[in-house]
């Protein structure tokens, strides 16, 4: 079968966008709507992955559980947010998807939205109660991801929703450390103007300025001094 991702026919139909065939199968056997495959995924997981909004809406109308997790702890919301499925994220949230659910890495849907620069989805999640400072198993937040990836608008969005700039991950790095290390100049400058400390040391006993390359460290030092002087 085209696009065979699952050992369950109903999941393959969901992934391939075969709405009519899916409806026919489920109406003949309602239990198929919630049956799990080799990855502990349901038809809803696979429809979210492939972005088939009509199939997602059909399944949600049937009342399928929205918070079931696959064998890696991914909920349909994780999958839709990571894949950039705006309309599906909206539909899942309306149906009560748990916005702060974590997968086996400790990541929320917001971690993936921030990492993959999904602006509208990040706003929907935050408006829906997502914790902007949620930490994964490495103590990294969405801000760590946005800063490291150079997603400037995402940094702005997270700041608007009061995300902290000085949380340290398991390596002792703040988002500013990561922005400096990856030479994300505009992101680093923005973080410093919004209260990110240039003095916090990571586990290698390095501050963001010591991690910064080229002339970035000097630029950040001047910004920080200017901010301190105006306080």
From Swiss-Prot:
Location(s), subcellular: Cytoplasm; Nucleus
Tagged with keyword Chaperone: yes
ANK repeats: 3-36, 37-69, 70-102, 103-135, 136-168, 169-201, 202-226
Xref: Gene3D superfamilies: Ankyrin repeat-containing domain
Primary location group: cytoplasm
Entry keywords, A to Z: ANK repeat, Apoptosis, Chaperone, Cytoplasm, Nucleus, Repeat
Protein name (database record): 26S proteasome non-ATPase regulatory subunit 10
The organism of origin for this protein: Rattus norvegicus (Rat)
Lineage: Eukaryota, Metazoa, Chordata, Craniata, Vertebrata
Gene behind the chain: Psmd10
